[in-house]
Curated annotation (Swiss-Prot):
GO cellular component: cell division site; chromosome; condensed chromosome; germinal vesicle; kinetochore; nuclear body; nucleus; protein-DNA complex
InterPro entries xref list: Cyclin-like_dom, Cyclin-like_sf, TFIIB, TFIIB_CS, TFIIB_cyclin, Znf_TFIIB
Function: General transcription factor that plays a role in transcription initiation by RNA polymerase II (Pol II). Involved in the pre-initiation complex (PIC) formation and Pol II recruitment at promoter DNA. Together with the TATA box-bound TBP forms the core initiation complex and provides a bridge between TBP and the Pol II-TFIIF complex. Released from the PIC early following the onset of transcription during the initiation and elongation transition and reassociates with TBP during the next transcription cycle. Associates with chromatin to core promoter-specific regions.
Protein name listed in UniProt: Transcription initiation factor IIB
EC number, as in UniProt: 2.3.1.48
Source organism of the structure: Rattus norvegicus
Keyword terms of this UniProt record: Acetylation, Acyltransferase, Chromosome, DNA-binding, Metal-binding, Nucleus, Phosphoprotein, Repeat, Transcription, Transcription regulation, Transferase, Zinc, Zinc-finger
Reactions catalysed, as given in the entry: L-lysyl-[protein] + acetyl-CoA = N(6)-acetyl-L-lysyl-[protein] + CoA + H(+)
Primary location: nucleus
Length: 316
């Protein structure tokens, strides 16, 4: 029951059985409840009061303190939309029982495609613990490629995966193709193709990867001590300087250097353990290791403490 006070132009909701009771408002459900008898006096009540809070968190992640998502500047309309709740009264339905007011988001097909790609990018980045700046750069790269329409015929998931790979390289935290493949549904070959096409389409480039780009992460994932990591880094760098590994990928050289350093220490790791982390096959590690093994005495740092002498290292 609603009664209007002379002192107040707005209707005041009261309990018909306890008109003087101060109603309790359930903000989540939008209900006005009488504390005396528990009667729900008003439902679907809208709070028309002023909102004095300031929202400084405009990240794309969910913010429980705001209504709806934050604005996305990469989309044409910022992804601002109106959500209509389900009706409860008879007036909310037509003669066939269907809701008269259906929730339709006024979003273009291109924005919808980009939104799906952005969600996929965020999911992939989260699975390999990449920071937000990588996600933002990837989203920007995808938007540029999508709007240029220069990769027509390529799946958006493949383009998104390649953009993530490029963003990692450009931000100085490179990931291998295998690592990107592991968190996407796209093959290494297809990501590689899109990678080359995107660089050409955007007329951009990425820095060449080196063994040092992966060494710290690989050794950390293998739970190797700092001494072994430093030795592996030194071995890989010297192998490149001495031109012992021409044509070999930095990842395979890094894996071989880690294998050599670990075998010389008390913290030994197998080729398979290293291969699983680096994303390379055992045979690939062996091929690079055989190239550097003959010069092993020249590759270790002078202060390295050997648990296994150089002449006792595996010959493979």
């Amino acid at each position: 029951m609603a009664s209007t006070s002379r002192l107040d132009a707005l209707p005041r909701v009261t309990c018909p059985n306890h008109p003087d009771a101060i109603l309790v408002e359930d903000y989540r459900a939008g209900d006005m409840i009488c504390p005396e008898c528990g009667l729900v006096v008003g439902d679907r009540v809208i709070d028309v009061g002023s909102e004095w809070r300031t929202f400084s968190n405009d990240k794309a992640t969910k913010d429980p303190s705001r209504v709806g998502d934050s604005q996305n500047p990469l989309l044409s309309d910022g992804d601002l939309s109106t959500m209509i709740g389900k009706g409860t009264g008879a007036a909310s339905f037509d003669e066939f029982g269907n809701s008269k007011y259906q929730n339709r988001r006024t979003m273009s097909s291109s924005d919808r495609a980009m939104m799906n790609a952005f969600k996929e990018i965020t999911t992939m980045a989260d699975r390999i613990n990449l920071p937000r700046n990588i996600v933002d750069r990837t989203n920007n790269l995808f938007k540029q490629v999508y709007e240029q329409k220069s990769l027509k015929g390529r799946a958006n998931d493949a383009i998104a995966s390649a953009c993530l790979y490029i963003a990692c390289r450009q931000e100085g935290v490179p990931r291998t193709f295998k690592e990107i493949c592991a968190v996407s549904r796209i093959s290494k070959k297809e990501i590689g193709r899109c990678f080359k096409l995107i660089l050409k389409a955007l007329e951009t480039s990425v820095d060449l990867i080196t063994t040092g780009d992966f060494m710290s992460r690989f050794c950390s994932n293998l739970c190797l001590p700092k001494q072994v990591q430093m030795a592996a880094t030194h071995i890989a760098r010297k192998a490149v300087e001495l031109d012992l590994v021409p044509g070999r990928s930095p990842i395979s050289v890094a894996a071989a250097a880690i294998y050599m350093a670990s075998q010389a220490s008390a913290e030994k790791r197998t080729q398979k353990e290293i291969g699983d982390i680096a994303g390379v096959a055992d045979v690939t590690i062996r091929q690079s290791y055989r190239l550097i093994y003959p010069r092993a005495p020249d590759l270790f740092p002078s202060d390295f403490k050997f648990d296994t002498p150089v002449d006792k290292l595996p010959q493979l």
